[in-house]
Amino acid sequence: MNKKVIVCDIDIVRKKGISYFQDNYFWPVSEHEYKDFVNFSTETYNSLLLDCKDNKVFDIMLQEYQFVDTIQKILHYNYVKNYSHEHEFTMLYGDQTKSLFFPDWEKFSSVFFKTTTRYTEFILFIKRILKNIIFNKFKFFLKKVLKPASELNFALCIGSMSDLKKTYIYDNEIYCDHKYWNHIINSKIKVDNELDLNKYSFVSSYLDALKSRNDLFVKGVDFRGIEKTWLKRLSEISSVYDHLLTIEKPKTLLVTDQANPAHKIITIAFQRSGVDVVCFSHGNNLAVLNQTIIHQFVISHLKKYVVPNETIKKNYEYIYSVLPIEKKTGTRYLSLNIPNINQYNNCQKKQRTFEKTKIMLIGFPANTNRLTDTAGDFSLFKIDLEYRIILKLKSLGYFVQYKAHPDRLDEISGIFNQLVDEYISERFENVINNTDLIVFTHAATTTFGYTLASNQPIVMINVKGNPWNELTYDALTKRVHMVPAILNNGIRIEFDQNYFAEKIKVAINSKYKYVANLGV
């Protein structure tokens, strides 16, 4: 192994080849170091947030979890850069990580107004009209619009039409006006650049806390540039927030895609104005993992969050209702009382016969994100692991399928295409029945929840340290065949390949019953 080289991203793995990556496998930031840093960063920000007494500043701080996440990601790569300089490593990186090693903080100064859209305002208007007709059902649409406005059960809707949202709308006979966020937030909003810096002192307090660590994460970081950029962001967010408080609003707002920055500020401002804002889960997150950090970033600003059924609701409440932030925001979990997701998703395994046993490996997103709540969930760690899993499955004579995420094809393309028997890029819902068994290396994906709700055999590479929800873990182990794994030196996932092979055999021949307290 050439210890003087650090392969920094998937671009280099693709360019140099998977064997080169294996021969030079190394990452300077261990799991323990990274978790320690992110926990410190998040807890510092949370403390400032909880101490905030100004409602507007509190709301904007909720919004700016997004920028905290950006800072954490960039400082992760700053550690790598500093380590390579101190220990005379050569960093090999491509376009994927170049902007993280050499960040242009100014590009983060706008949250809404520098965002490009695929469609013109006119096209968005036409799409809005069509969505209103299609999703409200044409007869239902005509029936409702002929009534006086006072008799309509009306709601404004933003975000995609998920199955949960659709069920909620139809069950409650809601006439939904579907809008794109661009119809609510537009470039005509005047940005007031005169911030009361005393009110927004959390910026300097948070950054000073990071600087005080004096470690490789923060060495050489342009904190003045970060602060300047952040204050510009806050000016824009503050102006948009004030605008949203003053515009005419419906009684009810229905929201999906809550992580979208525009959806988030609309949700927060409308909630503050007394609008009944109802938000919807993706539908396949059963809360079998405790993902507190990402949950706070994406969900904890909501007052109402709808999940499929009472069991899943209890799973969420058990983990997240104790969070101080959710106690302050008043987050409530609501159930649609769907008996089980299996019926809801209609993903029962069909009878079929393959000439050769097919095993589908679910690929990890090959991006630059490193998840903190879970163990070993970083693309370079997972590429290394997936390669060894593929080789083992091939050596056992199985037909190996690699399932790439449809939105991540450019990232993973060219890595495993020639190694596996079938490279799958279709939606998972369309291919779940085209295999004999599914292997996961991570559970922080809605694909895992969707598979739990089927009767497909599942084998999970379970890395030590995964924060399973203790309320559901016993039931989960009756449904999923767990293969224990560790993070060697905090950077390489290792598991017993013979035990893995045995688990594959057992899982394929098992019969599955749905486990009630998983909510499937």
Where do the protein language model's features map onto the residues?
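Catalytic-core helical/loop segments in enzymes performing group transfer/polymerization on anionic/lipid-linked
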Residues: 1-520
